[in-house]
UniProtKB/Swiss-Prot annotation:
Alphabetized GO MF terms: hydrolase activity
UniProt keyword terms in alphabetical order: Fatty acid metabolism, Hydrolase, Lipid metabolism
Annotated family: Belongs to the AB hydrolase superfamily. AB hydrolase 2 family.
GO cellular component, one term: plasma membrane
Entry EC number(s): 3.1.1.-
Stated role: Carboxylesterase.
Any single biological process term in GO: fatty acid metabolic process
Source organism phylogeny: Eukaryota, Viridiplantae, Streptophyta, Embryophyta, Tracheophyta
Active site residues of this protein: 151, 205, 237
Protein name (record): Probable carboxylesterase SOBER1-like
Keyword GTP-binding listed: no
């Protein structure tokens, strides 16, 4: 039964990774990053906003760093970005091959009914929470903390936001899925439910099927979580410039709101 779903996992992963690499390479080459290392360090020391970006399966943090060069509005002037890399782990959907992975994925493509591996997921969530706790301890207001992620990183973003005991600025999920069973919703605190979620998904996604993302909206609404769901026709398992432009405006709106209330 699983065999039919695992016919072409390596091909699917290759397509996902190539789409990510081509996207970031294109924008990195077309947008110069004028910030020096010393300037970035000064920015981090004065940061009042923290954005954590979680990459997809088989990818790395450094490969995604060029994304921050697209966010040039003054609202991001005092923003600290962090792009961690997942540790190497055997991945079931790739026949146990070891690759950068936040948690195990039993099968590809992912559908609304795909099995979950909550054990490895919760370990990854603890690591994300440790990163967030460190930033808050360093002086960042929880409402100025944002988690964003693509694919597997998007699924981890969702779990990390909803299982965090405090309200944070927001969580942005790109081409993700619900990585846990409905029974885990009793662990969502009332404060966690107040964190807004932005969910973006390509209708033509063949790796994390659109139905997997679409199923999130009623699930989150029933749990009492506010979620804005945006569908992108013609988009496969990748992030588009249109999605990132909307993410920028979505973040700016919340940053401005947080600034006016503080």
């Amino acid at each position: 039964m699983r065999t039919s779903r695992l016919k072409k996992p390596i091909v699917l992963l290759t397509i996902a990774l190539l789409s990510s690499v081509f996207f970031f390479a294109f924008f990195f080459l077309n947008k110069s990053d004028v910030s020096s290392t010393s300037a970035l360090r000064n920015r981090d020391s004065m940061a009042r906003t923290f954005i954590l970006w979680l990459h997809g399966l088989g990818d790395s943090g450094p490969a995604n760093e060029p994304i921050k060069t697209l966010f040039r509005s003054q609202e991001f002037r005092n923003t600290k970005w962090l792009f961690p890399s997942a540790p190497p782990n055997p991945v079931s959907c790739n026949y146990g091959a070891v690759m950068p992975s936040w948690f195990d994925i039993p099968e590809l493509p992912l559908t609304a009914g795909s099995p979950k591996d909550e054990s490895s997921l919760l370990k990854a969530v603890k690591n994300v929470h440790a990163i967030i706790d460190k930033e808050i301890a360093g002086g960042i207001n929880p409402e100025n903390v944002y988690i964003c992620g693509f694919s597997q990183g998007g699924a981890l973003t969702l779990a990390s936001v909803l299982l965090y005991p405090k309200t944070i600025g927001g969580g942005a999920v790109f081409s993700g899925w619900i990585p846990f069973n409905s029974s885990i919703t009793n662990q969502f605190t009332e404060d966690a439910k107040k964190t807004p979620i932005l969910w973006s998904h390509g209708i033509d996604d063949k790796t994390v099927l659109f139905e997997a993302g679409q199923a999130a909206l009623p699930f989150l609404q029933q749990a009492g979580v506010t979620c804005e769901f945006k569908a992108y026709p013609g988009l496969g398992h990748s992030i588009s410039n249109e999605e990132l432009q909307y993410l920028e405006s979505w973040l700016k709106q919340r940053m401005q709101s947080s600034s006016s209330s503080s």
